[in-house]
């Protein structure tokens, strides 16, 4: 599955599906595929890598996602930062992603890089937030 996800000659939908399956089977083995997909020319492949990363509880995906914040495509960058928020629980200033330019996103990537450089040695991926059970009434 990992090799299929990384293969630039494979159909995009096949690669995206291969990544989803690989994450379900053993997420700890997927950062290498996510890294390859994050650099793909096809923006839907990059978005799939950014989105899928939120289910990979490995520190190795954090710098990959940080690098994706400055992506040319806003929707890829937004997916990357949402995955970062989910994985790290790191709170950042509010930024207007809808109106952002590539220069804005490069600045925001620098903010995340600075944070990561200070945290990466000791950082532990926190437990995922659990949804509160609905109160029966």
Model regions: which residues?
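TPR/TPR-like (Sel1-like) alpha-helical repeat modules
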Residues: 69-74, 85-89, 102-105
């Amino acid at each position: 599955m990992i090799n299929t996800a990384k293969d630039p000659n494979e159909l995009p939908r096949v690669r995206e599906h291969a990544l989803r399956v690989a994450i379900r089977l053993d997420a700890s083995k997927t950062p290498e595929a996510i890294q390859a997909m994050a650099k793909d020319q096809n923006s839907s492949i990059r978005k799939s890598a950014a989105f899928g990363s939120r289910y990979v509880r490995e520190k190795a995906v954090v710098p990959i996602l940080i690098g994706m914040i400055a992506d040319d495509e806003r929707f890829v960058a937004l997916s990357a930062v949402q995955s970062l928020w989910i994985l790290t629980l790191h709170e950042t200033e509010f930024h207007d992603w809808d109106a952002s330019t590539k220069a804005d996103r490069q600045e925001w990537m620098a903010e995340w890089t600075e944070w990561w450089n200070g945290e990466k040695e000791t950082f532990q991926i926190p437990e995922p937030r659990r949804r509160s059970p609905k109160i029966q009434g």
